[in-house]
Amino acid sequence: MSSKGSVVLAYSGGLDTSCILVWLKEQGYDVIAYLANIGQKEDFEEARKKALKLGAKKVFIEDVSKEFVEEFIWPAVQSSALYEDRYLLGTSLARPCIARRQVEIAQREGAKYVSHGATGKGNDQVRFELTCYSLAPQIKVIAPWRMPEFYNRFKGRNDLMEYAKQHGIPIPVTPKSPWSMDENLMHISYEAGILENPKNQAPPGLYTKTQDPAKAPNSPDVLEIEFKKGVPVKVTNIKDGTTRTTSLELFMYLNEVAGKHGVGRIDIVENRFIGMKSRGIYETPAGTILYHAHLDIEAFTMDREVRKIKQGLGLKFAELVYTGFWHSPECEFVRHCIQKSQERVEGKVQVSVFKGQVYILGRESPLSLYNEELVSMNVQGDYEPIDATGFININSLRLKEYHRLQSKVTAK
């Protein structure tokens, strides 16, 4: 059979993408396996050997950890991005980072196709493909889990396991695996299996990135986090003097400290982009600390009315990231506006990390809008209390008129 061409497969080494690699070869494609190192615990050399053994023409293992932090996580920190008030977007942020490098490899290798193992029911298929089409409009995407010849053949995990046995694909898991996991620097997500019943509590052994808060140390770690333009540039542990200043090391250290204290666990039901609700359990240790610390320094340094507008932009940014529109013109516009809002977000925040919680202890900034003398109950300063009378009268006018009308309506 003549080759249909080369396809760059986003390969994880797990059951799905290992089977997809072999299946793509069956369909006549030359497969280039691409594995992104985005901070997950993985034996990358073992994954390389496995992909080559399964017939990959080439294997690329790309370390994108630093760019993931600086180009994706930092904008999320600046925006205080939360999807549906709770989700810090760990998976959502990783997908455009992974897919961007996948497209670069495809262009470099002259491959017309890219492929992924995302299911036809989830968000990741959208995130991967919108990135690919944005960066390489001519690219063709092979999405096996949306192709009848694939999903009719493999109706579930058991069928994949049987296919793996037939083709000598070494798989470390069994059909009884109780949930699926996805890990990167930002977080670990757990879903599917026994977690699909939203009433089922997460088993104690599920969590791998954070300590059980009840078993966490009995004394807190106090951290000082320094921000410039809304981005963390330095973290210092007040207890032992440990300091980190480079983006990747800083973020990894916060993961370590927060994980030790059980910070960053959530169990939620969220609305997927395609319309269904899903249950997800997430551990986001460093991201949780930075979310709270950044909120604090931002409130300390940013004008009230600017912050109201910025909060709306942050909500829109979270929605765009979650739904896969990282490379859209509207997301570029929102990111630019948020970055503008962060120009004066500078200073240091002290936080206590303890038993699953992050407590703000204090903050300082050379650009603070906080005026201690003006706000003091003991010093009058430039503020005339009598001026508040007119302020209240003007603001009460609308309320008086509204309730005057309501009284007339009620009387009728």
From Swiss-Prot:
Q: Which reaction does it catalyse?
A: L-citrulline + L-aspartate + ATP = 2-(N(omega)-L-arginino)succinate + AMP + diphosphate + H(+)
List residues binding ATP. 10-18, 36, 115-123
Query: Does the entry annotate any disulfide bonds, and if so which pairs?
Result: none
> Where in or outside the cell is it found?
Cytoplasm, Cytosol
> Pathway, according to UniProt?
Amino-acid biosynthesis; L-arginine biosynthesis; L-arginine from L-ornithine and carbamoyl phosphate: step 2/3; Nitrogen metabolism; urea cycle; (N(omega)-L-arginino)succinate from L-aspartate and L-citrulline: step 1/1
Residues that the record marks as modified (Phosphotyrosine) are: 87, 113
Name where it mostly resides: cytoplasm
For L-citrulline, which residues are the binding ones? Answer: 87, 92, 123, 127, 180, 189, 270, 282
Q: Which PANTHER family does the record cross-reference, listed alphabetically?
A: ARGININOSUCCINATE SYNTHASE (PTHR11587:SF2)
**Protein's UniProt name:** Argininosuccinate synthase
> Its encoding gene is what?
Ass1
